[in-house]
Amino acid sequence: MDIVLEATSQTETQVAVQLEPLSSNVVAIVPAAGIGSRMGAGKPKQYLPLLGQSILAHTLDKLLSHPLISQVIVALHPEDADFYALPQAKHPKLKTVIGGSERANSVLAALDKAPDNSWALVHDAARPCLMASDIDKLLTSRVQFPQGAILAMPVRDTMKRANSLGEINSTVCRDNLWHALTPQLFPTSLLRLHLQGALNAGAVVTDEASAMEWAGISPGLVAGRADNIKVTHPDDLELAELFLMRAKA
């Protein structure tokens, strides 16, 4: 499920940040140490087959082929027995690290291998339908949002808040609400600092943007494509297949 964010006014005070030049390297980080139990499969969901290769292979293809991404770092489970069988594992732009028990720990492990003067572009392993145009939009947004930004989608559906019985408690105003997507793009040293700080403080860190929010920084929101779905449930595989086939047509 995507995180839902509420947009803030651009006139609000921003915490001062140390900015990275746009010419800095862009390092893609893929946290892939999770199990993905909601798929009900016998293997991590990122290795489920999708149009002749795994979900993760499709995701890596999208990142490795982008000309502005200089390196891709994948955080793996210590007992991962599938990754090194992927053709992408031998790509010269790709590195691996051992991830942690939570997404944030895996991202931190990868950040430790990224240059300080770079931009970290963090993308879910199970989002195989990412388009190069969305990466381009996010990288271009560094001019407007030098503190970092994420791909997101405005909430279009009516939102309901439930009570403990699974009944509707209230209708939530959807004005300024966005679904958080990935990639999420931040200056590497800044993300490393605040991700570690948020974890040390016991803050709830569900994505990279939430660590920046914890530090008082308001990341930008960049409207992304609706087909950039996260494969979370079995039905999502059919939808991802449809989107990938349409992109190749």
Curated annotation (Swiss-Prot):
Biological pathway: Isoprenoid biosynthesis; isopentenyl diphosphate biosynthesis via DXP pathway; isopentenyl diphosphate from 1-deoxy-D-xylulose 5-phosphate: step 2/6
Catalyzed chemical reaction(s): 2-C-methyl-D-erythritol 4-phosphate + CTP + H(+) = 4-CDP-2-C-methyl-D-erythritol + diphosphate
One annotated GO molecular function: 2-C-methyl-D-erythritol 4-phosphate cytidylyltransferase activity
Site residues, Transition state stabilizer: R38, K45
Keyword set includes Nucleotidyltransferase: yes
InterPro entries per UniProt: IspD, IspD/TarI, IspD/TarI_cytidylyltransf_bact, Nucleotide-diphossugar_trans
Keywords: Isoprene biosynthesis, Nucleotidyltransferase, Transferase
Pfam families xref list: IspD
CDD domains according to UniProt: CDP-ME_synthetase
EC number: 2.7.7.60
Signal peptide: none
GO-annotated biological processes: isopentenyl diphosphate biosynthetic process, methylerythritol 4-phosphate pathway
Chain positions of site Positions MEP for the nucleophilic attack: R174, K230
NCBIfam families on file: ispD
Family: Belongs to the IspD/TarI cytidylyltransferase family. IspD subfamily.
Function: Catalyzes the formation of 4-diphosphocytidyl-2-C-methyl-D-erythritol from CTP and 2-C-methyl-D-erythritol 4-phosphate (MEP).
Name under which the protein is recorded: 2-C-methyl-D-erythritol 4-phosphate cytidylyltransferase
Organism of derivation: Shewanella oneidensis (strain ATCC 700550 / JCM 31522 / CIP 106686 / LMG 19005 / NCIMB 14063 / MR-1)
